[in-house]
From Swiss-Prot:
This is Ribonuclease P protein component. Keywords: Endonuclease, Hydrolase, Nuclease, RNA-binding, tRNA processing. Belongs to the RnpA family. Pfam families: Ribonuclease_P. Consists of a catalytic RNA component (M1 or rnpB) and a protein subunit. It catalyses: Endonucleolytic cleavage of RNA, removing 5'-extranucleotides from tRNA precursor. GO terms for molecular function: 3'-tRNA processing endoribonuclease activity; ribonuclease P activity; tRNA binding. It comes from Geobacillus kaustophilus (strain HTA426). InterPro entries: Ribosomal_Su5_D2-typ_SF, Ribsml_uS5_D2-typ_fold_subgr, RNase_P, RNase_P_CS. The keyword RNA-binding applies. Its EC number is 3.1.26.5. GO terms for biological process: tRNA 5'-leader removal. The gene is rnpA.
């Protein structure tokens, strides 16, 4: 995923937390902030040390980034997304992570209307 699609700075995370809307399920919390002037979406990831050691946390982040990469045609542009992983994610495989992310993105309005993501895992 290219650098322009990532949220890295603390100030940017804080802005999304404070001004954005949150949606959650048992595995993820997603904060969404509209940025109409931005022709693409950006994502920021937050995976706490409570979820496991570095290997586990990095695997979770890879899974989430890969999901966004595969779903990029269906994800609404002009938004910033901050994804916070919760405890159950540590034991999930890629297909389960993707299904859960699609669910919470749909709930948050992050998927384009009528966009049916392919369920190939």
């Amino acid at each position: 995923m290219k650098k322009k699609y990532r949220i890295k700075k603390n100030e940017e995370f804080q802005e999304v937390f404070q001004r954005g809307a949150s949606t959650a399920n048992r595995q993820f919390v997603i904060y969404t902030l509209d940025r109409p002037e931005q022709p693409y979406f950006r994502i920021g990831l937050s995976v706490s040390k409570k979820l496991g050691k570095a290997v586990v946390r990095n695997r979770i982040k890879r899974y989430i980034r890969q999901c966004f990469l595969e779903l990029k045609e269906e994800i609404a542009p002009g938004k910033d997304y901050v994804v916070i992983a919760r405890q159950p994610v540590a034991e999930m495989n890629y297909a389960e992570v993707k299904k859960s992310l699609i669910h919470v993105l749909r709930k948050s309005g992050g998927l384009k209307k009528g966009g049916q993501p392919s369920h190939s895992a």
